[in-house]
Each structure stands twice: as structure tokens, then as C-alpha cells.
Amino acid sequence: MQYKIVRNDISIVKADAIVLPANTMLREGSGTSTALYEKAGRAELEKACKEAKKRYKKQLYIGEAIPTLAFNLDADYIIHAIVPKWKGGHNHEYELLSSAYYSSLKLADMMSCK
């Protein structure tokens, strides 16, 4: 399966899915997160995140990925990659980050995203 990595304003990208770095609470962060929440529709995306968290399980773990609809974005889904907080690189951040993005790609494949 072929994927495209974009280093630009992903809130304007046309895609089946956009991968968004997320925290374990699926709450809006800063930077990229704020831009996507703004363009997608903050209220709808916040509600979808709460519902996804309940639907999948109560506790989300770093390294996992959870999908929601993308609402007003030019994409079908947002895949929320649960990423670690950077603590200097000595707390397995590289491995956990790699796991989060691997989980995202695996999920995109399962969802038939192109």
C-alpha cells in the first residue's frame, strides 16, 4: 500500500485519512492539533473523540491509534496516534513514537485508506 507523508498544513490536505499526534485523553493539544480541530469543527471533533474513547476502551495507551470522522476536513478520517511526551529520549520515546505511527498505518490499511 502506498502512503504519502506531508510536511505542510495537513488541515488542507485531501486524503482518506490524516494522522494526528494525540494524547491519551484524546484532547486537543497545540500546533497541528489546534489547526485540525479548528478546520474539522471543534465541537464535532471533541464529541467524536469522547465517543471513540468510550467505544474502544476507557484507557488509551501510548503507541495505539484511534479513528474518528474528519468532519469539515477534506479527508474521511482522522487517525489519532497516541504519542509520548518527549522526556529527553531516555524513556523509550523513540520506540513508543514508532509504535504509534505503525499502529496508525496498520489502522489505515484495515480501513482501506489509500
Describe the role of every protein-language-model region.
Residues 1-114:
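Macrodomain-like recognition of ADP-ribose-binding/processing modules
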